[in-house]
């Protein structure tokens, strides 16, 4: 795994599944806090019976057509760290302004480790990684 590395920045507050949430920064559900307690969270839009996601962002969309893909990205807790991978989404995923690029000969991106304060964009939806007590 490369991307932004798996080693936390010295002095950086660690994330934990019981405290960490995604804070939606724009759209009709702005300020919504999404707990990240599951080990693996598939992010996208429900499209039954074909697509079942853990975090359905359909109600958060800022316009039409939707900018979030049916299977957009996956968040996962690995070895005590929160990681993110784009799953080949049409409108992309960005972390702190950097687009997650697909790996050579693969539809998905490399894994990126998120930190407290990381800014994430799924299509045109903006989120921030925060602790739930903030």
Question: Could you tell me what each predicted segment is?
Answer:
Residues 50-52, 90, 95:
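Residue-level signal for pocket-adjacent positions within structured domains
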């Amino acid at each position: 795994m490369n991307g932004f590395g798996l080693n936390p920045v010295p002095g950086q507050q660690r994330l934990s599944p019981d405290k960490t949430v995604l804070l939606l920064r724009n759209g009709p559900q702005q300020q919504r806090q999404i707990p990240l307690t599951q080990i693996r969270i598939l992010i996208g839009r429900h499209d039954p019976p074909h697509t079942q996601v853990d975090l359905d962002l359909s109600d958060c969309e800022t316009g039409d057509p939707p900018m979030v893909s049916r299977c957009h990205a996956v968040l996962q807790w690995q070895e005590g760290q929160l990681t993110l991978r784009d799953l080949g989404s049409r409108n992309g995923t960005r972390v702190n302004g950097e687009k997650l690029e697909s790996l050579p000969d693969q539809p998905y991106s490399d894994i990126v480790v998120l930190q407290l304060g990381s800014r994430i964009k799924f299509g045109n939806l903006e989120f921030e990684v925060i602790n739930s007590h903030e």
